[in-house]
Design a protein with these regions (language model features):
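Cationic, low-complexity basic patches in intrinsically disordered or flexible, solvent-exposed regions
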Residues: 4
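Conserved beta-strand hairpin/beta-sheet module of binuclear metal-dependent hydrolase folds
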Residues: 12-13, 19, 25-105
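Short, P/G- and charge-enriched loop/turn segments at secondary-structure junctions
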Residues: 48-53, 134-135, 204
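Residue-level marker for buried hydrophobic side chains located in beta-strands
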Residues: 72-74, 116, 146
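Metallo-beta-lactamase
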Residues: 93-96, 101-107, 111-123, 140-206
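Active-site glycine- and acidic-residue-rich loops that bind
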Residues: 125-127, 205-212
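Metal-dependent catalytic neighborhoods of phosphoester/phosphodiester hydrolases
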Residues: 125-136
Length: 212
């Protein structure tokens, strides 16, 4: 099982003022059976209908957190650097992009101070790295620290065959070599952990697999 930082339980106190913005980064399609597993199709298709090929449409969203002079982006969407074949395979659509959605709120890529990656599947971390005009891959946010979990990072760098397609080295290696990657300290597995002193009141916990 994969280990990830659960973004679902990040905001646990209300003693500090934070402004939250939903950032839409596009839509894509995945097989409904693969996503819902043992849940019968008769149940899940009532909420998320599938097309003729059993594909369901999924939204990719990031969360932007404003606190004092810090801008924290939680997840980055699929990004724009992959091949047309890759995007066609996952039926990427929608006119939203990370850069344009941030610009609508008055922010540029250089304004982001922190990026928290809940886990390292390509639809969550792809936008963390961009491809320059000369083909070189580099972090999308030049002034940001990128936060992840060391144990999950090692898993993503050495995945099992079943998960290999979800972890792309081009999304990870440029962060590791840039010097911008930081690991969130992991304490007791089931205890909440303070994220960073610059975001007081912001806590996380570690979970195996996807969470709600």
């Amino acid at each position: 099982m994969t280990e990830q930082i659960s973004a679902a339980t990040l905001f646990l106190t209300t003693d500090y003022r934070m402004e939250l913005h939903t950032i839409h980064t596009g839509l894509f399609k995945l097989d409904g059976g693969a996503m819902f597993g043992v849940v019968p199709k008769a149940l899940w298709q009532k909420q998320i209908p599938a097309d003729a090929n059993n594909l369901c449409t999924w939204a990719m969203r990031s969360l932007l957190v404003e606190h004092e002079n810090r801008l924290l982006l939680i997840d980055t969407g699929i990004g724009a650097k992959q091949s047309d074949k890759f995007f066609s395979h996952y039926h990427l659509h929608g006119d939203m992009s990370l850069k344009s959605e941030l610009a609508k709120r008055g922010f540029g890529l250089e304004d982001i101070t922190d990026v928290l990656l809940t886990h390292l599947h390509f639809d969550h971390v792809g936008g963390a790295v961009e491809r320059r005009s000369d083909g070189v891959l580099e972090p999308t946010f030049p002034n940001a620290q990128y936060w992840s979990c060391e144990r999950h990072w090692q898993w993503a760098m050495n995945p099992n065959p079943r998960e290999k397609a979800s972890f792309l080295s081009e999304n990870l290696l440029p962060l590791e070599t840039s010097g911008q990657l930081v690991f969130v300290p992991r304490e007791d597995r089931w205890n909440r952990t303070a994220f960073d002193q610059r975001f007081p009141g912001l806590e996380i916990f570690f979970a195996d697999g996807h969470t709600e």
